[in-house]
Structure formats: C-alpha cells, structure tokens
C-alpha cells in the first residue's frame, strides 16, 4: 500500500485471525474491523487468514513470518513484544493497536480494537500534588523500567488476546457447524417428504390405471 520512504508509520496494528475457515463470520469480522483503521499503519498479522488477507492487500508487514494463532507460544509472544517495544521506543511508530476477537460466551464473540501503547495512565489531582511535594529520586530510570516491564506487559496482552481469539474461533466454528448440521437435517426431512409424496402419487396413479383397465 505504501513504503516507509513515502510516509511515516502512525501505528503498528496487531491483527489476530484464524488459521482456517468454516467459522461463520469470525475471520471476516475482525479483518473488517482492522481494515477500518485509518492512517499509515504497519501490520503484524497473527493467524494464517490474517497473513493471507494483508499480503493480498499489499499492506506494510512487520514480519514476513506466518504465525499460526493455534500454535503460537508464550515465548514467541515475548519475542514479538520485545521487537514491538523496541520499535516503539525508537519512534518507528507512534502507537500499537491490537485487533482480536473477545470471547464473551459460547454463543457470542465480539471483534474489538484496543490501544496497547502508549499507556493511558492519567494521574489523579492528588497524585499530581503528592508528586510535586515529593523529593524522592527514583532509580532505575524510566528508560530502564520501560525496557524491563513494558515488554512483559505487551507479551501478556498479546498472548491473552491470542487465547481469547482461539477460544472464539472454536466457539464460532462449533456454532456454524451446529447450524449447518441443523440445516442439513431440515433439508433431508424436506427431501424425504417430497420423495414420499412423489412415491405415493406414483402408486396412486398405478392403482387408478389398474382399476380403469379392470372396468373396461
């Protein structure tokens, strides 16, 4: 869609979708939500369907590696988190957003978008006043704290979103398959009814012809 040289990247968009289809609107809903993100974004796709979608649309990708949602590990999430926070710290993008499917129940799953970075931590007026009165010098520096803690936070958020997305995919697929099974059963019932009607009509026609022939 555009190169780094053409425009600055405003955000990194982590998009979690499924590895397979036959899950109702699960993949379509989260990909549609991600497509609504405005600005020049770089995409980190997780899930085969997510990778295929953004490759087809020639999006700027954070990595060329195809990460399967069902197989991604905690260790891989920590590795991604370190790369993400390092890119954010260097100013390669201004924000990190996460699009995934929140698991509400077996019947309900919702595609959502959340902002992971920057952290929204607005202090209260009391905290501001206490900070002004305080003469305490905190160590280590905020830079060291960011390097140590934020990657763990990002990894936890990403892995939690992956787990919810996988659970949502399984629930959506089960619902879709239940609906397909029910529809197939109803279709079989209708076809049996049509078959029995046609068979009965043929038998009635044969009896009518036999009776008519006997009367002659």
Question: For each predicted feature, which ranges?
Answer:
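C-terminal beta-strand-loop-alpha-helix "lid" module of Rossmann-like NAD(P)-dependent dehydrogenases
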Residues: 1-216
């Amino acid at each position: 869609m555009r190169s780094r040289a053409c425009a600055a990247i405003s955000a990194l968009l982590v998009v979690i979708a499924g590895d397979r289809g036959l899950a109702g609107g699960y993949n379509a809903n989260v990909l549609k939500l991600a497509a609504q993100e405005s600005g020049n974004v770089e995409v980190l796709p997780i899930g085969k369907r997510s990778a295929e979608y953004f490759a087809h649309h020639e999006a700027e990708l954070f990595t060329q590696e195809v990460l399967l949602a069902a197989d991604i590990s905690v260790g891989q999430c920590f590795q991604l988190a370190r790369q993400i926070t390092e890119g954010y710290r260097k100013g390669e993008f201004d924000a990190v957003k996460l699009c995934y499917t929140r698991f509400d129940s077996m019947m309900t799953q919702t595609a959502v978008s959340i902002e992971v970075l920057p952290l929204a931590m607005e202090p209260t007026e009391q905290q501001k006043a206490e900070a002004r009165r305080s003469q305490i010098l905190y160590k280590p520096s905020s830079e060291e704290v960011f390097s140590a803690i934020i990657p763990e936070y990002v990894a936890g958020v990403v892995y939690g979103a992956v787990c919810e997305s996988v659970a949502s995919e399984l629930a959506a697929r089960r619902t879709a398959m239940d609906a397909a099974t029910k529809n197939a059963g109803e279709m079989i019932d209708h076809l049996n009814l049509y078959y029995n009607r046609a068979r009965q009509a043929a038998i009635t026609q044969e009896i009518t012809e036999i009776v008519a022939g006997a009367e002659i």
